């Protein structure tokens, strides 16, 4: 609903005091919200750089500084900037999906299952990047089944079951919560 893909049955979604409900997806992106979808969804036949430029499709300013910033965050993408996105590894495609979202200069970046299907070493790298994005002042809304990794990077966390919030608190507090440990962390 926040990205404008589904209309909520009731309520409001406020970002800096502006209600996003009923706004088109391009209006939502213009307001500072981007999405890194589950399964990466890169444009396979386009190059890495073309995919990144698509992330900035609503912008009218120069992209050079932001391309450089994404390439600094993901040096591997710089090495492959002219390679077709469909030939990248799963981890590289995830980096590209995150980089594409960053090209819109978001205030809020939503990430849906960024660890899905990735090797454990790649997952650790992705979560380090999530920390770095947040350190840069961008709010990250993380939807993730890897509760252990998600809670380690979360300032605030919410546990949902069948669409309802059942627990909330600081990430580190929920990481140490016995009910969360038993149900989601396997301990």
Question: Language model features by range: what are they?
Answer:
Residues 1-187:
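Glycine-rich phosphate-binding loops of nucleotide-dependent enzymes
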């Amino acid at each position: 609903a926040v990205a404008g893909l589904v209309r909520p049955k009731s309520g409001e979604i406020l970002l800096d005091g502006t209600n996003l409900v009923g706004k088109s997806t391009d209006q939502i992106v213009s307001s500072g919200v981007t999405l890194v979808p589950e399964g990466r969804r890169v444009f396979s036949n386009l190059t890495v750089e073309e995919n990144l430029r698509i992330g900035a499709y609503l912008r009218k300013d120069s992209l050079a500084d932001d391309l450089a910033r994404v390439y600094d965050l993901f040096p591997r993408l710089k090495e492959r900037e002219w390679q077709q996105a469909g030939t990248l590894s799963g981890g590289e495609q995830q980096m590209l999906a995150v980089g594409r979202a960053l090209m819109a200069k978001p205030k809020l970046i939503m990430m849906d299952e960024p660890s899905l299907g990735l090797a454990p070493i790649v997952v650790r790298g992705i979560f380090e990047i999530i920390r770095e994005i947040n350190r840069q002042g961008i709010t990250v809304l993380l939807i993730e089944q890897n509760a252990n990794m998600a809670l380690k990077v979360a300032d605030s966390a919410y546990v949902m079951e069948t669409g309802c919030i059942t627990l909330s608190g600081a990430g580190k507090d929920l990481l140490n919560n016995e009910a969360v440990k038993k149900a989601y962390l396997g301990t």
